[in-house]
Amino acid sequence: MQLRSSLRLALLALVLLALARPATAVAEDAPFVGWSSLLPGLTLPYDVDSPNDCIAGRVQCVDQVIRQMTMRFKPLASSCDHDAIFALTYLRVTEEYRRTVETPTFFDDTSFVNHEDVLFARYYFAAYDAWAAGRTASVPPAWRVAFDAARDRAVSANGNLLLGINAHVQRDLPFVLYSVGLVRPDGTSRKPDHDRVNQILNRVTDDVIAEVARRFDPTIDDTNLPTTLDDLVLFQTIASWRETAWRHAELLAQAPTPQARDVVAHEIENYAESQARGIRMATQYLPLTGGRAARDAYCATHWAS
């Protein structure tokens, strides 16, 4: 009962965090790093006529991403690594995205969104690979908080999920959006397609939570109320983060100089990290509750179900 109460409080804390003022520095004397100078290494050109499926934004490249996500997820699942929670979630979201684009009219510019989807995944892969290789200086702070919490088995499955989403949406997504561009060649905004992704996220939320509960941690859905209120809170939190990511991408695009863009990038890093630290605090296992051990024991016999 104590664990259930803590998870409910975690959801409340996340709502408050989502309403916090964007891009607030973690500390006045935080070291300055020119993060925007790192962007060229993770860009991907876009050309619909390219023979390269990923550059052209063909759906075959999305299939490649799903295969890579599956390959990465399997060892995390079989070892009951706490990073498996976000890896599974991201895989299921991408699979639903793949099914969605079978309807060619869902997005205004499907090829472009395919291209963005692939680049977005590469940010996650790059962060995880750098962390796994011990190159922590190359890992964005929000991701370090997420990966460290998983390594230390410090937070609930709910915490692992939200730490991963926070790092990928509030940290990575602004840079991805800025990199690919916020407007079409005719000058119209790409935001309608950005917002349509929320429909995909809304469709998969319940099923993902149910699968995590079945395979890894049955307590992740202990907050479920007789209504769908808690699922609505979770989805609206993610939608709010995606809106913040778009606004932060606009700030990157509007920066008048590279130096000004570095300042915006630094604030994005600090904001995502501060959110991550708040999530970790709100979802950490309480001493002597046995939640961590019970979760790992459950996973050991259910991860393949």
What residue spans do the PLM features occupy?
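N-terminal Sec/ER secretory leader and immediately downstream segment
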Residues: 40-115
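C-terminal segment of classical bacterial N-terminal signal peptides
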Residues: 17-24
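Charge-rich, solvent-exposed alpha-helical interaction surfaces
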Residues: 65-68, 72, 89-92, 96, ...
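Long acidic/polar interaction regions in large eukaryotic complex-forming proteins
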Residues: 33-35, 40, 90-184
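Short helix-loop boundary/capping segments
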Residues: 170-239
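Bacterial N-terminal signal peptides that target proteins for export
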Residues: 1-10
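Hydrophobic helical h-region of N-terminal Sec-dependent signal peptides
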Residues: 11-16
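A cross-kingdom marker for long, charged
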Residues: 28-42, 49, 227-305
